[in-house]
């Protein structure tokens, strides 16, 4: 199914064509859509073939925890769309971010992260990783390049940020972060969930690793949970620290769990993702199910046209909200006058995605009343699908954060997150308008 030759053919095609055809090419009399391989095991007829699997000398499958042909096709498609050299799917976006850090960090290491990130990521970095002995230091992503570089320590192993902060909508200066990471001799890892490769491909601006919650725009229909890591193939894992020691021995030194195999020597520009699957997916079991891979793959086939409509609707809704007397403020990088408009135009010229944040005059109580009066728009703990949805992050996605931490993450107590769907633009605006009018 698919294969290397077909992937090379697809790289010469335009983005829209890659969305539709991706990594899969049906043979004669075979299904047009990717098949769902719902099997835990794979049969072999001699011990040698199985031994090759355990030594990572064969691309075939042996056990569903380590992947399946259906999941493989999604991984290849995500890598193709992001312009990467390899992809690796996980059970969720949280899992994708976690293993991207664990792949290169261990107890005693240090990570630098932009402060304006998804609440779940903030807790993962600030609480769970700290318990594992990995310190994540948060900082203002708008700091000058030299100030960011100055935060590095000898044990710093990664620089992390989100293309579009969730839900602050701060636009990450990708080239600045890439330059900072190069100066620190660490990989730049960026979560591209909100922008998607339809609007921004961070690897083109110097990112080394791209992560996704495919649960959002990639799937696009609210049907499947998943995550993905895409490797840029543009980082030298043999880099050494000031003392001449390897900074990333997990990739560039012998691995004790594979009889001394050196992942970077053997797999080159696919070393990061290969180790993710061979070690972390193997050990942690955060595997994507074949059905979720299938549904996400189906969603990706319409990614380009969906994002175009999300952007069109969002821009119209933003113009409506900015002029409504009951709206106190609005943050949408696609809106002229927004603080991050110029950065959005630079990195996302086709549009700043379909998510925005705004505040209703009257604060938190007024915001809650607004939500209760919506009829078409849904109150759900989700973004990035075909339905227009709203949420109050301070009491939901960022609820575990202290008030001080919420403010630091860009979460105003009255902030409303709005994910604009694919309904008729006028219908969306009419529903928002009638709910706002009832707050007066």
What annotation goes with each model-predicted range?
Residues 1-16, 322, 437-440:
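Basic/polar N-terminal segments that are highly enriched at the extreme N-terminus
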Residues 6-68, 76:
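N-terminal "arm"/small-domain region of PLP-dependent enzymes with the aminotransferase-like
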């Amino acid at each position: 199914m698919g294969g290397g030759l077909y992937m090379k053919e697809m790289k010469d095609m335009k983005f829209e064509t890659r969305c539709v055809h991706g990594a899969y090419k049906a043979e004669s009399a075979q299904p047009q859509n990717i098949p769902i391989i719902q099997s835990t095991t794979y049969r072999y007829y001699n011990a040698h073939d199985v031994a090759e699997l355990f030594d990572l000398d064969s691309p075939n499958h042996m056990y569903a925890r380590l992947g399946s042909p259906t999941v493989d096709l999604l991984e290849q498609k995500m890598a193709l769309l992001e312009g990467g050299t390899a992809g690796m799917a996980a059970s969720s976006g949280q899992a994708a971010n976690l293993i991207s850090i664990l792949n290169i960090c261990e107890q005693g290491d240090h990570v630098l992260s932009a402060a304006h990130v998804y609440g779940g990521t903030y807790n993962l970095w600030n609480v769970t990783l700290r318990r594992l002995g990995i310190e994540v230091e948060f900082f203002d992503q708008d700091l000058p390049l030299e100030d960011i570089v100055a935060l590095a320590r000898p044990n710093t192993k990664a620089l992390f940020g989100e293309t579009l902060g969730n839900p602050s909508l701060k636009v990450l200066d990708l080239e600045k972060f890439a330059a900072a990471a190069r100066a620190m001799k660490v990989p730049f890892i960026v979560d591209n969930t909100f922008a998607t490769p339809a609007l921004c491909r961070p690897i083109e601006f110097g990112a080394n690793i791209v992560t996704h919650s495919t649960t959002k725009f990639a799937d696009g229909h609210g049907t499947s949970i998943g995550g993905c890591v895409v490797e840029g193939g543009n980082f030298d894992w043999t880099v050494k620290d000031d003392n001449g020691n390897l900074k990333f021995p997990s990739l560039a030194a012998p691995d004790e769990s594979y009889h001394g195999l050196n992942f970077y020597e053997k797999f080159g520009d696919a070393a990061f993702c290969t180790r993710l699957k061979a070690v972390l997916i193997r050990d942690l079991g955060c595997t994507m199910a074949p059905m979720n891979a299938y549904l996400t793959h189906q969603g990706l086939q319409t990614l380009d046209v969906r994002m175009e409509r999300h952007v069109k609707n969002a821009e119209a809704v933003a113009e409506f909200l900015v002029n409504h007397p009951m709206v106190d403020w609005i943050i949408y990088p696609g809106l002229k006058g927004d603080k991050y408009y110029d950065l959005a135009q630079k990195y996302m010229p086709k549009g700043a995605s379909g998510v925005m944040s705004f505040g209703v005059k009257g604060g938190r109580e007024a915001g809650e009343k607004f939500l209760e009066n919506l009829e078409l728009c849904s109150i759900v703990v989700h973004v990035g699908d075909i339905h227009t949805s709203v949420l109050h992050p301070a009491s939901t996605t960022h609820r575990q954060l202290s008030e001080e931490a919420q403010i630091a993450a860009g979460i105003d107590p009255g902030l409303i997150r709005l994910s604009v769907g694919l309904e008729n633009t006028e219908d969306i605006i009419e529903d928002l308008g009638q709910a706002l009018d009832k707050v007066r």
